[in-house]
UniProtKB/Swiss-Prot annotation:
Keywords: Ribonucleoprotein, Ribosomal protein. This is Large ribosomal subunit protein eL32. The keyword Nucleus does not apply. GO terms for biological process: translation. One of its GO terms (molecular function) is structural constituent of ribosome. InterPro entries: Ribosomal_eL32, Ribosomal_eL32_arc, Ribosomal_eL32_CS, Ribosomal_eL32_sf.
């Protein structure tokens, strides 16, 4: 796939994501236990209006809401995110396709080492703040 097509697919995905609703479980507004944990759960009730896809009821996820397969799961910049814990893991990355995200357990001293080495290798770091 050429660079131009890849950029186009990223733009298509961004446009789709803007229109995509939040898929929340049925009657999430009614119970406090659902408000604190707003995950999607398929409606299975025999009289469920949401399962029947009635007008005015919340939308359900379907294959039409998904992003193009070639850019699915990528960072908005187009890189594949890889979680990094040390400099050794950083050196395994491909700078053209992958970007590093430094794990939250990494301390300040090791983070500085990782950032220096990433700059030498030309690898993009997604969370470079100290």
């Amino acid at each position: 796939m050429d660079e131009k097509e890849f950029k186009r697919l990223l733009r298509v995905r961004a446009r789709l994501k803007r229109k995509k609703p939040r898929f929340l479980r049925q009657e999430w507004w009614r119970y406090p236990k659902f408000k604190n944990d707003p995950k999607w759960r398929r409606p299975k009730g025999i009289d469920s209006k949401m399962r029947l896809k009635l007008k005015g009821k919340p939308r359900s996820p379907s294959i039409g809401w998904s992003s193009p397969r070639l850019v699915r799961g990528l960072h908005p910049s187009g890189y594949e995110e890889v979680l990094i814990h040390n400099v050794k893991e950083l050196e395994k990355l491909d700078p053209k396709r992958q970007a590093a995200r430094i794990a939250h357990t990494v301390g300040k001293k090791k983070r500085i080492e990782i950032l220096k080495r990433a700059q030498e290798l030309g690898i993009k770091v997604l969370n470079p703040q100290l």
